[in-house]
Structures are given as structure tokens and as C-alpha cells.
């Protein structure tokens, strides 16, 4: 998308096949930029937190996408950046993410999906977060009923602020100047810190913008 100035790939792996693939991408696409682990330590999810120190440029909006996101709707970047700019009061903003526990919760309470029982609004809920069979069924449900049919807009549920609660940061946007205020120092679990601890310390909410998938 033209609105994207740079595509950073966080190289948090020792797998040489993956690294060579990343290098080929950077050679082929001028916008691709490889970011190496700032401390030179690669330890899976435990070494992700250091990368945020390089996400503090002022006058910049950062959008973090997990590497297992396989589809997003046309104009996702434009719509989410506009929402981010129009709603500066939130710390993080996120679109609707299929197979994200709190996104599933919103689909449930807005009667967009019928589940076998009521599931609570908990990021680590045993079924809607950790059950692989549930995840597979959810993806099939989305693809067969909404994606292939071109009806995914029917799942939009609007704007939902939230606070003092963890959520999966599969796709989130923040302002570089806000991250710069604490130098991008993210201790421990980046998801717990960025979705719950830091916004709570700042007295801010996060917001789901569920008019984008």
C-alpha cells in the first residue's frame, strides 16, 4: 500500500532458511527493511520485547502484524491509519482479527456467531484462545460463509474501547512519539505490557475498530 513507507521484518530467528528468505525479500522490494534483534539475543517470544526500542520515531504511526496473519481486507492500512489519527486518545488500536479471543467475544455478543455456550471476555480463555479445533472451525466458518461469499462486511461491529485487560496484539497500531516517551522499553511479555500494563499506567484505554478485518 502506498500509505506504508517501510515494511520492517523483525528477524527473531536463527533459522538460516528464514533469514535467507528475508534477505531476498529485502533485495527485491525497496520498502522491506530487516531489523535484527537489538541485543543480539534470539529466544523466541522472550526476545521480541527489545524490538520496540526501534519503533519510537516521532510523526510516525507503527502497525505491528503477526507473521501468521494470512489475509486482510483491501484498504486495511488506509482505514486503520485514519482511525488511528482520528482517535489519538487510545494507546493501541486494533481491527477485528479472526481467531483473536476478544474479537471472537465481540462477534458472540453482537450475535454474529453462534457458539455452543457463552464464553467470557478473557484473552486466555481456554476454548476461544487455546483450542486448536475451535481455531480451525472458526477459520472455516469465516472463509466459507463470509470471505469466499464476499460478505465479510456483515461481521463489522463498530468501535469498542477497552481498558485494564489483556488482548492478543496480532495487529495493533501506535504512535511513535508515545512509544518514545518510555524509549520503547518493554519489560517481559510484550503483549501483557503493551495491551494492559502501560495503558493502565497512563490512564488510557485501547480500542477495537471492528469495521475492518
Language model: regions and residue ranges:
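Short, acidic, metal-binding catalytic loop of nucleotide-sugar glycosyltransferases
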Residues: 1-4
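Long, low-complexity intrinsically disordered regions enriched in Ser/Thr/Pro/Gly
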Residues: 6-11, 24, 28-29, 97, ...
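Active-site-proximal specificity loops/subdomain of glycosyltransferases
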Residues: 12-64, 70-76
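Short, solvent-exposed loop/turn segments at secondary-structure junctions
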Residues: 14-16, 40-42, 68-70, 98-101, ...
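Short coil/turn segments at secondary-structure boundaries
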Residues: 21-23, 75-78, 106-108, 185-186
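Conserved catalytic core of nucleotide-sugar-dependent glycosyltransferases
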Residues: 79-180
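Active-site donor/metal-binding and catalytic loop motifs
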Residues: 176-185, 203-213
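Acidic donor-binding loop at a coil-to-helix junction in glycosyltransferase catalytic cores
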Residues: 187-196
Amino acid at each position: 500500500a502506498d500509505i506504508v513507507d517501510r515494511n520492517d521484518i523483525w528477524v527473531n530467528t536463527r533459522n538460516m532458511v528464514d533469514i535467507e528468505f528475508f534477505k531476498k525479500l529485502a533485495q527485491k522490494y525497496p520498502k522491506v527493511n530487516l531489523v535484527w534483534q537489538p541485543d543480539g539475543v534470539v529466544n523466541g517470544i522472550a526476545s521480541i520485547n527489545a524490538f520496540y526500542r526501534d519503533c519510537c520515531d516521532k510523526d510516525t504511526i507503527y502497525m505491528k502484524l503477526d507473521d501468521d496473519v494470512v489475509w486482510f481486507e483491501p484498504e486495511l492500512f488506509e482505514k486503520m491509519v485514519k482511525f488511528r489519527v482520528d482517535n489519538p486518545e487510545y494507546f493501541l488500536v486494533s481491527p477485528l482479527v479472526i481467531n483473536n479471543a476478544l474479537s471472537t467475544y465481540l462477534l458472540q455478543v453482537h450475535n454474529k456467531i453462534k457458539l455452543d455456550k457463552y464464553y467470557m471476555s478473557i484473552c486466555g480463555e481456554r476454548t476461544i484462545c487455546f483450542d486448536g479445533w475451535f481455531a480451525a472451525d472458526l477459520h472455516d466458518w469465516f472463509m466459507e460463509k463470509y470471505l469466499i461469499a464476499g460478505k465479510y462486511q456483515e461481521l463489522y461491529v463498530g468501535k469498542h474501547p477497552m481498558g485494564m485487560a489483556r488482548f492478543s496484539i496480532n495487529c495493533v497500531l501506535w504512535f511513535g512519539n508515545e512509544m518514545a516517551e518510555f524509549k520503547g522499553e518493554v519489560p517481559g511479555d510484550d503483549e501483557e505490557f503493551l495491551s494492559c500494563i502501560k495503558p493502565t499506567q497512563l490512564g488510557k484505554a485501547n480500542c477495537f475498530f471492528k469495521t475492518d478485518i
